[in-house]
Curated annotation (Swiss-Prot):
Segments traversing the membrane: none
EC number: 2.4.1.25
GO MF: 4-alpha-glucanotransferase activity
Name of encoding gene: malQ
Record's protein name: 4-alpha-glucanotransferase
Length: 526
């Protein structure tokens, strides 16, 4: 595996130098899915600490997370209301400073912890209870001491670029009972009113800003622990953002909501997809030296060593729908989109110490793939989808993957591997034959171990599998209904999306001899 030839003199060389070019093996999961004895109904920042310990003990060196940004009332981590702010729902309540001064605190925490026993994350109950608790905590334990809190004052100053707009936006959202921006009166959307709005909603702005300070402290603690235990945290920075977001409201010159982003027609969708997300004004971003992206990356590097860029092709060209329903690529000239993508990604590489990994699934022009390799940016390889589609549709041998890539059996938007095997027996049989493995309609533990091990032996430098695909090795750790193991089904509106919960607690997993034995078997000898 000669990754150095791709990375040594690339614009990403400084990031590779920090993490090294030895093969890396990891797990991939949403934070909201895990729970410990201290969790309050949903995965929390400090729950990552026992997960890091488990990973180090087992031999994993990467934990990949879905986006951790504040999503407001939405549950999708890819529909955030801020490109920077973290989600206060992930705060570890039991570890907040001076929490013992809250009346009946033990009972309140226990009531929220019991929500971890539901089969999936109950966002309605979790949000109701956690937000009520956070407001009580702020009023009784924090508000009176803010003026003398020098660390908080420094945080307000250092993060003012995004924090004051976010705090003000959140305060107005609360005042407007969650109404979308396009339903706000003009007095709340005119930019010249922003200083007055920050003053008008001063108390609420401080509340939401202080929650971000707490999120920052807890996730920094997690990052420090991960560094000490030689485990890389891989974040996820979505390229697109909700039109009902702080960024579109405040940094409006960087976006256009009159047109929207989507995907062109293909074999699976003859009409294409309209994601109803605003497009970037790349010329204005460039004019301001990409400060919006630079600030976003600067803050994220406090928490991550590596980060996923979903839909990385979008930095080169986007499929744009106009108001009449016509779609086209912008820019559509290869010379123009290669120039644009190279400029933006080179700027992003220079803006932080983190290493980006591109989600380059689907139809990607060869010149884009070549450019990503020259930049030292990894792509993504999913063995069941990696075929010579332009010729005989044969599976591509895992040993032939570009070393500058991450191999993963499944994604948060796909069936789990066991679910795919059950639902697509014809393809699964072909895949088993390709790997020289026996085929049975129900995926056996032995075959799944073999396939997981082969995924870790691919030519890719990164091997990061969905945590669900490891848990499936033990029937007692997953639902009998495999559909419940799926994280998201794109194009559907369902409470099942983004509510997946890992059944056992992390404490239970740590002492599960059979499960840990299987993991050891998969990783031994790599």
């Amino acid at each position: 595996m000669n990754v150095l030839k791709y990375t040594k003199h690339s614009p990403s060389a400084h990031a590779w130098k920090l993490i090294g070019t030895s093969p890396k093996h990891g797990i991939y999961l949403p934070l909201f899915s895990i729970h410990t004895k201290n969790s309050c109904g949903i995965g929390e920042f400090l729950d990552l600490i026992p997960l890091i310990s488990w990973c180090q003990k087992q031999g994993f060196s990467v934990i990949q997370l879905l986006p951790l940004n504040d999503t407001g009332e939405d549950t999708s981590p890819y529909n955030s209301i801020s490109s920077v702010a973290l989600n206060p729902l992930f705060l570890s309540l039991s570890s907040l400073p001076n929490i013992d001064t809250i009346p009946e605190v033990a009972k309140k925490l226990q009531d929220m912890h019991e929500l971890c026993s539901t089969p999936s994350v109950s966002y309605t109950q979790v949000k109701e209870k956690k937000w009520a608790f956070l407001r009580e905590y702020y009023q009784k334990c924090c508000k009176s001491s803010l003026e003398g809190n020098s660390n908080f004052s420094e945080f307000l100053e250092s993060e003012r670029y995004w924090l004051y707009p976010y705090g003000t936006f959140r305060a107005i959202k609360h005042h407007m009972h969650g109404e979308p921006i396009n339903n706000w009166p003009k007095s709340l959307t005119d930019q010249e009113n922003f200083p007055d709005l920050t003053k008008k909603f001063h108390d609420e702005v401080l509340f939401f800003s202080y929650l971000q300070f707490l999120c920052y402290q807890q996730l920094c603690e997690v990052k420090a622990y991960a560094d000490q235990h030689h485990v890389l945290l891989k974040g996820d920075l979505p390229i697109l953002i909700s039109k009902d977001s702080c960024d579109v409201w405040y940094f409006r010159d960087y976006f256009s909501s009159s047109r929207s982003v989507g995907a062109p027609p293909d074999l699976y969708n003859s009409e294409g997809q309209n994601w109803h997300l605003p497009i970037y004004n790349f010329s204005q971003l460039a004019k301001d030296d990409y400060i919006w992206w630079k600030e976003r990356l600067r803050y994220a590097q406090n928490f991550y060593s590596v980060y996923r860029l979903d839909h990385i092709i979008g930095f080169f060209r986007l499929w744009i729908w106009d108001s009449s329903g016509r779609g086209r690529f912008i820019p559509d000239n290869p010379k123009d989109y290669i120039k644009q993508g190279t400029e933006i990604l080179s700027t992003m590489l220079g803006a932080s110490s983190m290493l980006p990994i591109g989600e380059d699934l689907g139809i990607i022009p060869q010149d884009v793939k070549t450019t990503l390799t020259h930049l030292g940016i990894c792509g993504t390889r999913i063995p069941r989808w990696e075929r010579n589609w332009e010729s005989d549709s044969a599976f591509i041998p895992l040993k032939d993957y570009n070393p500058l890539s991450v191999t993963t059996l499944s994604t948060h938007d796909s069936d789990t591997f066991a679910q795919w095997w059950l639902n697509s027996p014809k393809e699964a049989k072909q895949f088993a034959k390709f790997l020289h493995l026996p085929f049975q309609k129900t995926l056996t533990t032995e075959t799944q171990i073999d396939i997981l091990k082969l995924s870790h032996e691919s030519a890719s430098i990164f091997h990061i599998n969905l945590f669900n695909d490891y848990l499936a090795l033990c029937p007692d750790l997953v639902s009998k209904n495999l559909q419940r193991e799926r994280i998201n089904t794109p194009g559907t509106i369902s409470k099942k999306n983004w509510s997946y919960r890992v059944r056992p607690s992390l404490e239970e997993l740590a002492i599960h001899k059979k499960f840990n034995g299987y993991i050891e078997k998969i990783l031994t000898g790599l």
